[in-house]
């Protein structure tokens, strides 16, 4: 059945690739917090209820990792993603130029058709991290993809001299990687046009591995910025951006805001590439520190979720792994963290963002810092629940609105991102 239905779906998708679909719409809220944590076991197995809805956190039904409010596809869950395993085993050809693209697209279309309902309108994230689509971005352990590409070129073009073979390896890899990522997005958007499709960790920034020197600025690495400019085709093909703002375990807390700010500013920069209106930016936030497993502190939440809201991101995606729901004890730890720390802060930020939107932007845009470097300006309610002073914020209007306070209607589809 798969082999019969898949190509038929791809054929229909191919006929629609030039339809000129408008960007999908985002729920009408200035700042969204989404739950991408596999916590379904907490209630189903251990009877521990996590009150996400009451805390203003958007989750899938039953709190499943994949669902109709948001979904993420890992490397083995959509099509035939090529990569090398830990022992060097090639999966799906190992490198993009060895992959039969039509078979990949057929399978991806089949999987999307059967996993997401036609009206799906949430974030749909592709998590493909094994290689970078640009040759120069494959350093460290990723050099295996350069070596395999050179071996491929030597086999396919045996009569060329080594320098020409290297050129074929380089161009062949980049062209095939681009076709794979671009066409996967196009197929996905044609099948589920209201979904917010994009790749996790794109754009990169390269600001997380600097030394702990006192002169840390948080600015993105120059080479990474140049690669992001080269990836203009990826931003043009995406309908949302999902940068990672996971706090580095060794980075001093005093530098957290600079780290997050520059990652988001780079996402805002490329969000305009190939689009009349900037793409929504939804940053990935990890609930626990990678090495210690500790939940993010109140200050960590301010410097990740709070900074994202203050800079004008469309929202954040909260991510966690299966360990958070691996036992009744772990589920209660998660429950207590939600109720005591995370939930109250999410309520504060989302309500403040909504209040600022209505007070300053007529409800037709989101508030963002006038000066991104104004580190003390946040969208927070006062401790007594009263509204803050939004003088440090200006309006970023939704699609269909313009003016300093988003008071002027503009023709075109309305977008509330």
Curated annotation (Swiss-Prot):
Location comes to: Secreted; Cell membrane; Cytoplasmic vesicle, Secretory vesicle, Acrosome; Endoplasmic reticulum
**Gene Ontology process terms (BP):** carbohydrate metabolic process; cartilage development; cellular response to interleukin-1; cellular response to tumor necrosis factor; cellular response to UV-B; hyaluronan catabolic process; inflammatory response; negative regulation of ovarian follicle development
The active site lies at 129 (proton donor)
- Domain EGF-like positions: 352-407
Q: Which domain of life is it from?
A: Eukaryota
What is the catalytic activity of this protein?
A: Random hydrolysis of (1->4)-linkages between N-acetyl-beta-D-glucosamine and D-glucuronate residues in hyaluronate
Q: Which GO terms describe its molecular function?
A: hyaluronoglucuronidase activity; hyalurononglucosaminidase activity
**Keywords for this entry?**
Cell membrane, Cytoplasmic vesicle, Disulfide bond, EGF-like domain, Endoplasmic reticulum, Endosome, Fertilization, Glycoprotein, Glycosidase, Hydrolase, Membrane, Secreted, Signal
Q: Glycosylated residues?
A: 69, 215
Which Cys-Cys disulfides exist here? 42-331, 205-220, 356-367, 361-395, 397-406
State the conditions that upregulate or repress this gene: Expression is not significantly up- or down-regulated by ultraviolet irradiation B (UV-B) in epidermis.
Its GO CC terms are: acrosomal membrane; acrosomal vesicle; cytoplasmic vesicle; early endosome; endoplasmic reticulum; extracellular region; lysosome; plasma membrane
InterPro entries xref list: Aldolase_TIM (IPR013785), Glycoside_hydrolase_SF (IPR017853), Hyaluronidase (IPR018155), Hyaluronidase-3 (IPR027260)
| Matching Pfam families | Glyco_hydro_56
Q: What does the record say about PTM?
A: N-glycosylated.
- E.C. designation(s): 3.2.1.35
Signal sequence residues: 1-20
Instruction: Identify which top EC class this enzyme belongs to.
Output: hydrolase
**PROSITE patterns listed in its UniProt record:** EGF_1, EGF_2
* Organ and tissue specificity: Expressed in sperm. Highly expressed in epidermis of the skin, where it is expressed intracellularily in the deep horny layer (at protein level). Bone marrow, testis and kidney.
- Record's function text: Facilitates sperm penetration into the layer of cumulus cells surrounding the egg by digesting hyaluronic acid. Involved in induction of the acrosome reaction in the sperm. Involved in follicular atresia, the breakdown of immature ovarian follicles that are not selected to ovulate. Induces ovarian granulosa cell apoptosis, possibly via apoptotic signaling pathway involving CASP8 and CASP3 activation, and poly(ADP-ribose) polymerase (PARP) cleavage. Has no hyaluronidase activity in embryonic fibroblasts in vitro. Has no hyaluronidase activity in granulosa cells in vitro.
Give the record's family classification.
Belongs to the glycosyl hydrolase 56 family.
Protein name, per record: Hyaluronidase-3
Provide the species name: Homo sapiens
